[in-house]
Each structure stands twice: as structure tokens, then as C-alpha cells.
UniProtKB/Swiss-Prot annotation:
This is Multistep phosphorelay regulator 1. It comes from the Eukaryota. It comes from Schizosaccharomyces pombe (strain 972 / ATCC 24843). The gene is mpr1. Keywords: Phosphoprotein. Residues 182-284 form the HPt domain. GO terms for molecular function: histidine phosphotransfer kinase activity; protein histidine kinase binding. The lineage of its organism: Eukaryota, Fungi, Dikarya, Ascomycota, Taphrinomycotina. It holds the Pfam family Hpt. SMART domains: HPT. Residues 97-106 have a biased composition (Low complexity). GO terms for biological process: negative regulation of G2/M transition of mitotic cell cycle; phosphorelay signal transduction system; positive regulation of p38MAPK cascade. The modification Phosphohistidine is found at residue 221.
């Protein structure tokens, strides 16, 4: 009975792992398709003849996207993809990703149709063949390295579109510890956070200049934790991103980044986002205490 049960568990585990791997693959393809569209690469890959892959290869190759003599950070496709950091504000990107990943029959190979991602100006179905990002990567339109960058950038809208600067379910727990209407206790915690955050952001800049990835990861982890205590949602997310980049991982920690050069470049771009989110959080909290103080 024990052997039978163990075999059943092993079979279940394998089936579960296969389903998870399939879902992850589908999500990655959808993320890549969305990101390619948002960066304009999918648009350039469109072929009037209906033959997307060779056409895309010629176009991207002609633009220098596959020029291996170029540093990856100077690659036109890389520049197009990473320009989305803190700049892409399309309202329908999250829904697009959800639509792309939904409803794939189990056991089938996922092919992501990017035709629905193209602007209405080009919505001629005959000219918009379904094309999987896997095929684009396989054909040399995007290198494996660039596919990792595209995967990572596909999370950008989640951070930008999140309107929740502060999670009040967390912050209000801190306020409940105040003994008076002056909020002296919570205010001391918040003011201490301001000092810590400003010092840490300055240290992050120094670590970036020194190209110290280990230090960058550690500082990102520290600021993520202190931001989480106050319920500063956006600060927590962007600091977690820096923590993972410093460990040579994608922002969600799933994929390995191609090089230290890429990690440092992504951290550099993310630091400007940290500064913006910190200023927003600081202004919000100062205003909150000004309005909610009895004096």
C-alpha cells in the first residue's frame, strides 16, 4: 500500500509540475508578446505578405538589433524595451496580458497571437498573422538575452498602474498604536523612515557608482522591508526589484539576468523610480499628519 501511495504521489507531483511549467511558459509568452507590442517591436515585425518571421528578422537585423558587436545595452531592441521603465502608462496592458494567457487548453503548445496587440490603424487581419514570441526568438528576431529583458519589462505596467501609494490596511494598524490625536508614536516611526530612506537612497547611488551588486541587493532588501512596515506599496515593489536585480535575477526573481552590465543598467533606471515614489510617499504622509493633527 505504501509503495502504491508513493507512486501516486510521484505521479501527482509530476503532473502538477508539468501544469505549472506549462502555465509559466504561457505567461512568459504572453508577457513577451505584450512587451514587444508596447516597445513597437511587434509593429515592426508585421509583414504585409503575412510572413511575419523572415520579415521581422530582416527589419530588426537591418536596425542593428542582432549586431553582436554592440553592447547589449546599446542594442536598439534593448533600448526600446527598457524605455518602458516608468514611462509606459497604457491602461489596457494588464487586461491584454490576462487575455493572452487565458483559456489555453492543457497539453497544447501555446502560440501567442500578437495581432490583437497592434493598433487599430493596422487592424487588417490578412496582414496580421499569429506569431509566437518563441518563434520570434527562435528565428533570431530577439536573442535569448533580449527575451529575458522583454519578460522583465512586461511587469512595468503593474507597478505604474497601481494607484495604491499606501496600503491603509497596514498603515492604519500603526495609527492604532497612537495614544493621542497628535499621533506622536506613528509620527516618530514615519519620521525615522524618512531619515532611513534618504540615507539608503544615497547609499544606493554610491553602490551603483561602485558597481557593487551585492550591496545594491542588500540595500534594496532593507528599504523594501522598512517601506512594507508603513504599507508603502510602490516603494516596496520597486525596492524588491532592485534587490532582485542585484542578485542577477529578473524583478520577480524567476529568471537569471544575462550579465552584471544589464543588472546595473536596470538598477540605474529603477533608482529614478525610487526617488519619484519616495517623494510621492513623503508628500502624502506629511500632508496626512498635517491634516490629522489636533494642533
Amino acid at each position: 500500500m505504501s509503495v502504491y501511495r508513493d507512486n501516486m504521489y510521484m505521479k501527482y507531483d509530476r503532473n502538477f509540475e508539468n501544469r505549472v511549467a506549462r502555465r509559466n511558459g504561457q505567461a512568459r509568452n504572453a508577457s513577451l508578446a505584450k512587451t514587444l507590442h508596447d516597445s513597437g517591436i511587434a509593429e515592426r515585425a508585421r509583414s504585409p505578405s503575412g510572413s511575419a518571421i523572415p520579415h521581422a528578422y530582416r527589419v530588426m537585423n537591418g536596425s542593428g538589433a542582432n549586431d553582436t558587436s554592440l553592447p547589449l545595452t546599446s542594442n536598439p531592441a534593448y533600448v526600446a524595451l527598457t524605455s518602458r521603465i516608468s514611462s509606459s502608462k497604457s491602461e489596457n496592458n494588464q487586461q491584454l496580458a490576462a487575455n493572452e494567457t487565458a483559456g489555453a487548453p492543457e497539453g497544447t503548445e501555446e502560440t501567442v497571437d500578437i495581432s490583437n496587440s497592434i493598433s487599430d490603424d493596422h487592424a487588417n487581419a490578412k496582414n496580421l498573422p499569429a506569431a509566437s514570441v518563441k518563434a520570434l526568438v527562435g528565428a533570431g528576431v530577439l536573442s535569448d538575452e533580449l527575451s529575458v529583458i522583454a519578460y522583465d519589462m512586461s511587469f512595468e505596467d503593474e507597478l505604474i498602474q497601481d494607484k495604491q501609494l499606501i496600503d491603509h490596511s497596514v498603515f492604519d494598524q500603526l495609527l492604532e498604536m497612537d495614544d493621542d490625536d497628535e499621533h506622536e508614536f506613528s509620527k516618530s516611526i514615519v519620521w525615522n523612515y524618512f531619515e532611513q530612506a534618504e540615507t539608503t537612497i544615497a547609499d544606493l547611488q554610491k553602490a551603483l557608482e561602485a558597481k557593487d551588486l551585492k550591496k545594491l541587493s542588500s540595500l534594496g532588501h532593507f528599504l523594501k522591508g522598512s517601506s512594507a512596515v508603513l504599507g508603502l506599496t510602490k516603494m516596496r515593489k520597486v525596492c524588491e526589484r532592485i534587490q532582485n536585480y542585484g542578485s542577477l535575477r529578473s524583478r520577480d526573481g524567476v529568471m537569471k539576468l544575462p550579465s552584471e552590465e544589464i543588472a546595473l543598467d536596470l538598477i540605474s533606471k529603477s533608482l529614478s523610480v525610487v526617488n519619484d515614489f519616495y517623494k510621492d510617499a513623503r508628500a502624502y504622509l506629511l500632508d496626512f499628519y498635517e491634516k490629522n493633527s489636533s494642533t
